[in-house]
Structure formats: structure tokens, C-alpha cells
Amino acid sequence: MKRSPGKLVTAVAFAGIGIVAVLGAHLLFAGQPQSGAGKPLVGTEPVPALTPYVEEHTHFDYTDPDGTVRSALAALGRQNAAMIFFQMPPDTFDHPGRFDAEVLLPTARKYRGKVAVLGGGGTLNAMIIQSVATGDAGPAVQKKFKQRAEELLREGVIGFGEMAAEHYDGVTPYQYAPPDHPLYLLLADIAAEHGVPIDLHMEAVPQDMPLPAGLKSPPNAPMLHANIAAFERLLAHNPRAKIIWAHAGADGTGYRTPDLCRRLLQAHSNLYMEIKTDPRAHGMNYPLADGKIKPEWLSLFTDFSDRFIMGSDQHYPEPKGPEQRWQELVLLFNQLPSDVRRKIGTENIAYIYGQSVASHLSAVKN
């Protein structure tokens, strides 16, 4: 059900009524010791965003799409989120439980303007991983790949994601594909033609390196392949293709530094990045220290305020416990200057995703 502009303004205004009071309570506790960066104290109410934002990267319970969407709709007001996007986990053909956008699209269509779906993680991504394994990226494979991508677009996905180039074992298996693989180059062309983005999960690996300490091989590869140069070739292949590099702030190699992000953003105008903070797994090069944005990250977000979006990797329904990913990210978001919040919160999303999303955000007041 499409939300009318009048209803959207009312909803956003209503969601903001409690922000000042709740934020005041948060600031009251800000000077007290906390067990995690930016984490609200146990027992306090959730702290919503100071201004509306789009939660661009979330996942869901594929066995209960209706419950997932109900949970997300309930979260909109609690978070002061204008929209929530669901992405498919990047997967392989031999992994039980693989799925794609078709499991969620019928439910999501009922709530256009509130939730939206990216697709391809369970099929396009699996086709790329299979192609890497077989070495076959010939005309027949490319034809089948393009047909599937265009089928997803006809069904109503607003982008391709979550795709993977270097992904550790977890909910889905370990995955590696060169970001300049022929099927990724083809996907960039398809994305550019249809005006939709690609959302890519890729650990930063400037040169071949051993698997970082703390991770096991198997199931992960013992050595990680260099991928930054190949990633730049993907970005340069079709400058009209908007590429979102997922999870800035959740570094699994030690190389996704603000300096690397800055260099790539300067070099490639079609590159965008999601900000992710996880209170339970900081990883390396975390953007927060004692709840405060580190200066080097604040400078990056400010200097490239037109290139970042919010993507917490939150799961819906929310896991039990107070440490929600969206909350940690909102506490970071609330520290940004108001003009930067406006861009990162909604304006960049409207530009990246185009009119199909921008029309729903036009009435949002930042």
C-alpha cells in the first residue's frame, strides 16, 4: 500500500515527538561508563534518529515473510526510519535453505513506500560463485545470468544485493569471486541500463594475505585473494553503474581504513558506501570509541557526505537483547552535523535508487 505524502508527513512528525525527551535521557547517561561503544544502558528506551533516515541493508526470516514485514513496520517509528530495505543473503547453489527475493516480494508489495526489496543474493550471486568454480563464463552462462537479473527487475526488486566478492563463512558459506569477474562486469552493465545499484559485500584485501587470526580454515579459505585493484576495474568498467560497497565500519581484515575509503571515493564517482556498526562485533577500524565518532571517520563522512548511506545489517524480527545493530548506527548518525545527516539519511538514497524510491521520500522532513 503506497503511503500518501500527507500520511507520510504525519507519520514522520508523530515519530519525532518523543525524540527530544528520549535523546535527553541518552545524553544524561552519556558520561557514565558503558560496556560497548555507543550502546545505550540496559533498561533505557530505544533512542530514535534525530532526523528520518532509510535503513538500506537489513535481512529477514525467510520462513516468516509476513512476520518479518510486521516487525519492520513496527520498527519504523521506533527508529524514526522512513523506509527499510531488505536484502537477500549472498549464497551458493549447494547451500540448503538458499532463497531469493520471491519469498518476500508478495508481502513487500503491500507496503510500497515503507519497505522495499533487493534481489539476486540467492541466484545471481550463486551463479557467479559457480562460474568461478567451473571457469565457465561463456555466452550461454552470460545469457542465463542476464535473463535472471532482468526477471528479478520485472518482479520488482529495486537493486541487486546482497552480492559477495569476499565473504566469510557464517549464515551462508565462505564465498570468493573476483569483483571484475565477467559476470560482475555484466551485472554492472545491467544495473546501469536499468538505473539500479549493486550492493556488494567485500572484505578489503589490498594484496594476497593469510586468513586473519580468529577465523578458521576450513570453512574459510586459508589465503585471501587481493581484490582492491579488481574492484577498481569493476568501478571503471561502467561509470554509470552505481556500486554500493557494504559495511564500512565493519572491517574483517584490518585494511578497510578511512584512508582506503577516501582514496577510492576520490577516484570513483560511482562508488557509494554503507555505514555499519555492530555493538557485538566491532571488528577492526571501528568508527566509534566510547560512543563517540572517531575524528578520521567523522572527517570522511563529512567530506563525502553525498556518498554514504545507512546500512546496519539489522535482522528482522529483531534478535533478543538490547544490543541492536540499528541502535548503534543511529547513535553514530545522531552525532553528525544536520546537513550531513540529511544527505546520508535520505537524499543519497533518493539519488542512488531513483524515482521509484525518491517519490516516497519527497515528503520526508529532515
Where are these regions (language model features)?
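Hydrophobic faces of well-ordered beta-strands that scaffold small-molecule active sites
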Residues: 54-58, 83-86, 115-120, 160-162, ...
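Active-site gating/metal-coordination segments in enzymes
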Residues: 40-46, 51, 98-206, 211, ...
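Mid-to-C-terminal alpha-helical segments outside catalytic/metal-binding sites
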Residues: 5-14, 26-54, 67-94, 299-309, ...
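Alpha-helical scaffolding within the catalytic cores
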Residues: 38-41, 68-72, 97-106, 143-148, ...
